[in-house]
Amino acid sequence: MSFTRQLTKNLTSFKVLAPFAAAVGSVGIAYQYSTSSIMNETGKTFTGNDEWIDLKLAKSWDTTHNTKHFVFELANQDDVSGLINASCLLTKFVTPKGNNVIRPYTPISDVDGKGSIEFVIKKYDGGKMSSHIHDLKPNDTLAFKGPVVKWKWEPNQYKSIALIGGGTGITPLYQLMHEITKNPEDKTKVNLFYGNLTEKDILIKKELDTIAEKHKDQVNVVYFLDKAPENWNGETGYISKEFLQSKLPGPGKDNKVFVCGPPGLYKALSGPKKSPTDQGEVEGALADLGYTKENVFKF
């Protein structure tokens, strides 16, 4: 069963699956929908039920050559989305032939933010949903449903975490980093290792750099580029086993590694998920360094 079909099936049936390890739920482990805590609460747009909700596009702008930042309005200015960290929403549109196209997207806006919800979305060649969203104009609507909880973050769950991402995989990792650093009581150390093809492909770099600058004693961000310019002051090439070995404390109950990115990144560093509900064993560089599925979570 495909990723989005599995998500839709679980939302439709209201099933709450058991957590794996410390997680309350996840796209890669188990889809737990926080219906009990948010159902019927006023001011929350998404409550985990089977209702598709149309949101109006307020504005959008280009952030890279193939990526846009989108702001969708909630029904009321005092409403919040109802999402938690880290969670995503399903999106849907109907083709001229009557076929449903459904895809998940992770917001980058603060879950406590009022009145709107924001996404950074890359347009892929042949991507039906990403192309549709990129074609939206202000006041056009898009159908959303959720939330789909991927990992429920609790402050100080770990002494340190590593966020390893590539391309658009940055969005759930940014969610976690933002959630941790906005809470002065959360002392979790954060290492973000983020790979892209070129400098212009780096998503939400301004936001990442702002957090890193503001929280120098807590957050470390390292960028990797396959094709780096001459004046590049980050890393060049792929995120390697040797690099991870030099930067990570090693597997243990006090730290966790979160991975999100394209198939090649999973293959090289953590191994792929077996299915949307099965994380599978850890493979690749992290396995070589002694990490197991208790130490690694794959978005």
Swiss-Prot record:
Lipid bilayer topology: Single-pass membrane protein
One Gene Ontology molecular-function label: cytochrome-b5 reductase activity, acting on NAD(P)H
Subcellular localization: Mitochondrion outer membrane
Alphabetical keyword list: FAD, Flavoprotein, Membrane, Mitochondrion, Mitochondrion outer membrane, NAD, Oxidoreductase, Transmembrane, Transmembrane helix
Domain of life per record: Eukaryota
InterPro entries: CBR-like, Cbr1-like_FAD-bd_dom, FAD-bd_FR_type, Flavoprot_Pyr_Nucl_cyt_Rdtase, FNR_nucleotide-bd, OxRdtase_FAD/NAD-bd, Riboflavin_synthase-like_b-brl
Transmembrane feature ranges: 13-35
Residue positions binding FAD: 157-192
Enzyme Commission no: 1.6.2.2
Span of domain FAD-binding FR-type: 50-154
Reaction catalysed by this enzyme: 2 Fe(III)-[cytochrome b5] + NADH = 2 Fe(II)-[cytochrome b5] + NAD(+) + H(+)
Main location: mitochondrion
Pfam families, per database record: FAD_binding_6, NAD_binding_1
Enzyme class: oxidoreductase
Family from the record: Belongs to the flavoprotein pyridine nucleotide cytochrome reductase family.
Known role: May mediate the reduction of outer membrane cytochrome b5.
The protein, known as: NADH-cytochrome b5 reductase 2
Species name: Debaryomyces hansenii (strain ATCC 36239 / CBS 767 / BCRC 21394 / JCM 1990 / NBRC 0083 / IGC 2968)
